[in-house]
Amino acid sequence: FDTILVLNFTGAKEFKIFESFLRNKHFNSKIEGDISFIKNFFFNLNFDVNQISLRKLLFRFLPENETPVVLNSGISKKINGTIKISMKHSQSFIGRINDLNMVLVFENGDLRIKNGSAKLPHDSTIEFDLLFADNSNSPFLDFSLNFYSQNTKKFLRKFNIYRSVDKETSLSAKGKINLRSNKIKFFSIVSDKSEKFDKQDVLKIEKNFNQNVLNTGILGATDFFKLKKFANELLN
């Protein structure tokens, strides 16, 4: 896991970072921003990502069938600041993803991902907010997702789903994943802005997701074949 970090900066206790970069076999990014050591360690950085192998990078820190390092040690409460991440494009199991943007907020041991957004294939978009917190040694991931597609039929074909659907579809979901038990709990699922899923449907989706996606850990949420199986059992 060889990593090259080059920092060019000016300043003493407050540093201005410029023309810097972080590179390894999974990640390549330009870096600029500010770092301060006055009173406490604080940073405000911009990462302009040129290349990323997200799933491989996640496997480094969240290996399947092992207790993830982050769950053993947590995130230091001394790490506070923000990292704005932008990426023009990346390849994924559903095709090319464009204009990926998000803000990582580190605050007293919690990690929040705010204002996440990306353009997906077939005129589809996703917006997301995430919160990772270690609450009394019970780490969890809160999530809020908003998906919209102007060509739902073509998008679903990526998952070998050929059922008749409306051309335009929206779906919003909020919930929590227990990172110890690898179980998901949905607070709400709403389709096409107003149709809220009833309790029985939500329980069915939770059971399906836990059995087919999270059965080997949180990284199942990035596994195309697991997501494909989940979607097929749910929609076919």
PLM-predicted stretches and their roles:
Residues 1-236:
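Membrane-proximal interfacial segments on either side of biological membranes
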